[in-house]
Amino acid sequence: PSQGKVIVVDNGSTDNSIQLLNQEYPAIELLPFSENYGFAEGYNRAIAILAKRFEYIVLLNSDVAVKPGWLTPLIAYLDANPDCAAVQPKLLSDTRRSHFEYAGAAGGFIDRNGYPYCRGRIFSVCEPDNGQYDTPADVMWASGAALTVRSSVYLSCGGLDKDFFAHMEEIDLCWRMRLAGWKLAAVPASVVYHLGGGSLPAENPRKTYLNFRNNLLMLHKNLPDSTRRSTLLRRRLLDTIAWTKYIATLDFKNAAAIWRAHRDFARMRHNYDRTTRPTVDLIKGQPNILLQFYLRGHKTFDS
């Protein structure tokens, strides 16, 4: 939109990013931080500064390529749906533009065991985009790679959890928005292309650690007492199977990452014990995608 403003948040970069921006794009507003606060706290600090100026904030990763007019359908959807807190575009892979991209595809969901999946992506299988998800849809979570959110809701729901540092923090925020009564949506009339893996490669043990630890923290925070313990017990069993697989393939670094994730979850979960516990289980009754994917061979969302 013509009234929009491009703001670059420099999260403690150590290259010549700031110099390049000042020289090549002097009209862009720059918000530099002296250190890398991570994906979560970097956005929190920026939005706390910018929220009074803007009704909507767009969280856009630096590895996302956009097309002219991509933002217009997202803003229009929020304007027309005041009960919706945040929206995402259709995310396609920047390296294989005929296919959906891992980190959001056409909108995210969470299965009964806490595993995130998407319209267009189950586990690591990304579907080709054949227009099968070209209608707007309510979703459980929207991708943080290109998230348009009401700044007031972002702040009232607590923003991204800085203890996550990176990975899955937008899913946690979306879960809290849903618990607060807000809707979330995927708006496929808007299309962007995401490179992905810009922070950490897929098989990096640090990524494995953050994904496993943060998923456990997210479940601990957002599930009611009535189902939290049983869900976490199932996850401990399933994560043990994943650990065994890494051991069997001699991938000891990723096996150690899972062990550290559970160790640190046990240490960190008490930080959330004083928060108000949810009373609604938003993933109860959702599909079991492990069963659907591995035993029944269902590799696509619509199957």
Report residues per predicted region.
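Glycine-rich, basic loop-to-helix element that forms the pyrophosphate-binding segment
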Residues: 32-50, 62
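Active-site-adjacent helix/loop segment of glycosyltransferases
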Residues: 180-274, 280-289
